[in-house]
Structure formats: C-alpha cells, structure tokens
C-alpha cells in the first residue's frame, strides 16, 4: 500500500440493485483506499459482478450512492465510468485481436494531424508506455500474436493511460499459467505503488494472499466484512464467504468398486491431425477418469474429438462394444455421450433463455423439433432437476444469465442428465465457481458415478482430481503422455508427470 494508504478514493453507501425475485445487491457499503489492491470475494451469486457493473455504469443502482474522490457519481455507461476514472479489464480481453498493440492502446484517441493518422508517433508512444512498466515488445505486431497474459497487460496499460484512478480486474488469472500470473502480479504491484487503486476479483484464494492488501467479502448480495489480508486466516475467510463451515466431506473419496469391466466407451489410436495426437482411452460404468495437463496440453481438444465437435480422422471408437463414427455432437448424444464444456457462457448456456428452456434443450434436440416436449412436461422436468440438484433460482422461468456460475453449471448438468447418458464428459466443472459450490458439484459427480455413469473429468484443480478420480491421464503438447493409477495417485505425482 502507498503512503496514502488511509485516503479513501472510492466508496459506496447503501448500494442496492434488484432483479425480479432477486436482491443482487442489498444495501452494500464498500470502501477502497488510494494505492491498494482490494480482493473482492464471495460465492457465485454473492453480488460481485453486480457491484462491478454498478460501479462501471453497466447497471444503474436502484438505491444508494457511489462516491469517487469525495464526489457523488452516477456512471451512465462504461465509457462514462472510464472518463470519471474507473476502468475495467475482464478475463476475456475486450480489445481488437487482429489490430496491432499500438492500435489497441490508442484506439479512439489516435494522434492525428490534418485528420491523418500519425502512425510513427503512435507507435513511439505505445512503445514508451509499455516500457514504462517494464515490457519490451514490438507494438506493430497484431495483439493476437501475444499470450493471453500479455493481451491483458496491454488492456491494463490502455486503461491506466486513459487516466484510470480505479482499475477493476475481473478474474484476470483464470486462463494464465503460474509464470503469467506472476507477470500480471508484478504489474499490479507497480500500479499500486504508483497510487492506482485496484479491485481484484478472483476465485483463487492462494492468489488473494499473494497480492492483495485487504479483502472484502460479499454474500447473497450483502456486505459481510472487510479485513486486512495479513490478519485474516484462510479458514476464517472461507467461513465469511460461506456463512458456514466448508463441507469437506465431498472432497474425500472412499474406495470404489467398478460396476463392470466392460468399457462404456473405448478409443484406440483415436485422434485428429493438427488437433490432438492419437490416444487410447477406456471408461467403465461407475468410473471417474481424470484428464490433467497445463493449458494448451490438449485436454479440451480430446473432449471435442470424442464428442464429434472436431471429428477424428484416425483410430477407432467403440461405444458399448460397437464400432461408431462420431461425426457430430448430435450423433454422440444419440449414442449416450454428454459433454459439459469449459466455457459455459459461450458454448453451454443460452443466456437469454429460461432455466426450463436450457434444461430441456439437449433432449429436445435429440428427439427432433417435430416431436416437441409439451410445456407441462418441460415444467415438470425443470422442477424435478431444480429440486434434485439444488439449483437456486426464483423460478423455472428465470433467465439463466441471472443465475450464479455454480447454478448455471448445475443447469448444464441437468440438461445432459435428462438425456440419460452413459458416458459424460465434464470440462472444468468447478472453474469459475465459489468454494461452496465446488463441494456441491463434486458431490454430484460422486452421485453420478455411484449411479453407474462413466465420467471423464477435465480439471486444473489437482487436489479435486486426486479426491475423486480412479485414475488420471496426463496430457502434454496435445499428446497423452502418462496414466497414473489410483494406488499412485497424488498431487506431486500428477505435477511430476506434467513436468517430465
């Protein structure tokens, strides 16, 4: 924290935002000091995103006041918030990937003379701006030639150069590896030391303790508390977030007896040139096979080839003992395969559609649109899964975009469970959801396994994989490089295999 550590720069008083049947923010008081990194934490549905959107003009609060440097403000939109001095950088960088770094840094405010772009001057200023934070790169190169971490750094530098006094970083490390995270943290510390105030939204608690000065916790739309990071034990932080003790029972797995030795799905030398090297994989009823590896190792590509999103061009696939050609997701679904993708918002949910409509989607697609599911049956199905999976929603007709990440994930699980699959692929099932929902999702995974479902689970949460997987396959450079049996399964064993 800077020498102005006690000088408040941003404050909300009684901030409230309501949606039909939901108090997204309820009388929230929030305070941010000049030159500090504030972690903003809470379960999904706690109100973090709503608070950010209220601060940046995406939403207009129904009640309460926002104060910036002692002045009451009411941002009309994100551009107005930026003019006032509040900038935001999201996990998915909101820049123009095909344009140069310099173009992205100065888009909308390019140096011109007589109406003509002064490109050399812009590139010089862009180089100087990046160098001022210790980054040396060719600003003439397209942004998409750089890593996700560097793209985020460019977005941050742009926001700061636009005179941001407060910078909100929303899940900036979700797609970064360890080295990239440290690169980002170095920049965050530089900004803090220069007097910029940062709000850091994340689900990674270890990172909170690495980089933040204070922690604010929200729960169910309400302010729970704000504490100095160095004075808050992690177990107490979890209690603040959950309002209860963390249920660790779901993270502990007893031994499991497989229901059958015959694989539900078996793949031999199965692969797709340019996507994933040929691999062997068998999954049996009641078995959980984990898939581990670094980002870009080929985990998601493996799932996409199996599910027919990127059809294989080599090898054989046996589903319930019969050779099959998995050429499309529809064909895979008909054969009893389900797939919950990593990116819920892009590849999973239909944001504006209701919970009911999202749940019945896969079953309706399998039946065909000439055999519609009646509205009464849809309602009964949705109510049954809301009850069975504990989906928190005011009604079956609530647009799914207003549900928390954990509840969206449960809706996606419901969608595929409704089709009664025999083989289900889960890609990062607990990513982007809170610590409490983690345990709930893992409990669901265990229940599905006990019911005889064959599961392939892709996860970066190694402790979780060790907790529930029967064996773990290791991916590296889009190849299957190792398999760790249950007797040898541990976090160090997985990490050593990944790094070998």
Swiss-Prot record:
Which keywords annotate this record?
ATP-binding, Cell inner membrane, Cell membrane, Membrane, Nucleotide-binding, Repeat, Sugar transport, Translocase, Transport
Gene Ontology CC entries for this record: plasma membrane
**Gene from which the chain derives:** ytfR
Would the keyword Repeat be found if you checked this record's keyword annotation? yes
Name the enzyme's class. translocase
Classification via PANTHER family: CARBOHYDRATE TRANSPORT ATP-BINDING PROTEIN MG119-RELATED, GALACTOFURANOSE TRANSPORTER ATP-BINDING PROTEIN YTFR
Tell me the protein's name.
Galactofuranose transporter ATP-binding protein YtfR
Instruction: Give the protein's biological function.
Output: Part of the ABC transporter complex YtfQRT-YjfF involved in galactofuranose transport. Responsible for energy coupling to the transport system.
Q: Which CDD domains match?
A: ABC_Carb_Monos_I, ABC_Carb_Monos_II
Q: Which SMART domains match?
A: AAA
The keyword Translocase appears for this protein: yes
Query: What reaction(s) does this enzyme catalyze?
Result: D-galactofuranose(out) + ATP + H2O = D-galactofuranose(in) + ADP + phosphate + H(+)
| Amino acids binding ATP | 42-49
Q: How does it assemble?
A: The complex is composed of two ATP-binding proteins (YtfR), two transmembrane proteins (YtfT and YjfF) and a solute-binding protein (YtfQ).
Per the UniProt record, the source organism is Escherichia coli O157:H7
| SUPFAM superfamilies named in the record | P-loop containing nucleoside triphosphate hydrolases (SSF52540)
Q: Which segments constitute the ABC transporter domain?
A: 10-245, 259-497
* Compartmental location: Cell inner membrane
Signal peptide coordinates: none
């Amino acid at each position: 924290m800077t020498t102005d550590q006690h000088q408040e720069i941003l404050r909300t008083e009684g901030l409230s935002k309501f949606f039909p049947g939901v108090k997204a923010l309820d009388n929230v008081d929030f305070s941010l000091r000049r030159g500090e990194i504030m972690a903003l934490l809470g379960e999904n549905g706690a109100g973090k995103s709503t608070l950010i959107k209220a601060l940046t003009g995406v939403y207009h609060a129904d009640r309460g006041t926002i104060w910036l440097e002692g002045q009451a403000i009411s941002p009309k939109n994100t551009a107005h918030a930026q003019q006032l001095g509040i900038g935001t950088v999201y996990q998915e960088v909101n820049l123009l990937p095909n344009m140069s770094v310099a173009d992205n840094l100065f888009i909308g405010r390019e140096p011109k003379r007589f109406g003509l772009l002064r490109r050399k001057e812009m590139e010089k200023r862009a180089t100087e701006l990046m160098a001022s934070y210790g980054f040396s790169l060719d600003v003439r190169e397209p942004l998409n030639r750089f890593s996700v971490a560097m793209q985020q750094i460019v977005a941050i530098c742009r926001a700061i150069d636009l005179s941001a006094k407060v910078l909100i970083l929303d899940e900036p490390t979700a797609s970064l590896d360890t080295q990239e995270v440290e690169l980002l943290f170095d920049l965050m510390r530089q900004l803090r030391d220069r007097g910029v105030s940062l709000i850091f939204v994340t689900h990674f608690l270890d990172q909170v303790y690495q980089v933040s000065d204070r922690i604010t916790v929200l729960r169910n739309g309400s302010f729970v508390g704000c504490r100095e990071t160095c004075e808050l034990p992690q177990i107490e932080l979890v209690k603040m977030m959950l309002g209860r003790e963390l249920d660790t029972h779901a993270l502990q797995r007893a031994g499991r007896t497989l229901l059958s030795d015959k694989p539900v799905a078996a793949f031999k030398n199965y692969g797709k040139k340019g996507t994933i090297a040929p691999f062997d994989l068998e999954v049996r009823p009641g078995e959980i096979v984990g898939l581990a590896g670094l980002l870009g190792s080929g985990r998601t590509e493996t799932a996409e080839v199996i599910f027919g999103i990127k059809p294989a061009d080599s090898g054989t696939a046996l589903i319930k003992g019969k050779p099959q050609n998995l050429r499309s997701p529809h064909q895979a679904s008909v054969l009893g395969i389900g797939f919950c993708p990593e990116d819920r918002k892009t590849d999973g949910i239909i944001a504006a559609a209701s919970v009911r409509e999202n749940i019945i989607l896969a079953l309706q697609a399998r039946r065909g649109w000439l055999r519609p599911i009646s509205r009464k049956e849809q309602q009964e199905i949705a109510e049954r899964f809301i009850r069975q999976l504990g989906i928190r929603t005011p009604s079956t007709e609530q647009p799914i975009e207003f549900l928390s990440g954990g509840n969206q994930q449960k809706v996606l699980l419901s969608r595929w469970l409704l089709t009664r699959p025999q083989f289900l692929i889960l890609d990062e099932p607990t990513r982007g959801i809170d610590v409490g929902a983690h345990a709930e999702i893992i409990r669901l995974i265990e229940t599905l396994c006990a019911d005889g479902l064959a599961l392939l689970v892709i996860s970066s949460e190694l402790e979780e994989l060790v907790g529930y997987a029967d064996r773990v396959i290791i991916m590296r450079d889009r190849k299957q490089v190792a398999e760790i049996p249950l007797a040898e399964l541990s976090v160090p064993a997985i990490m050593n295999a990944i790094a070998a």
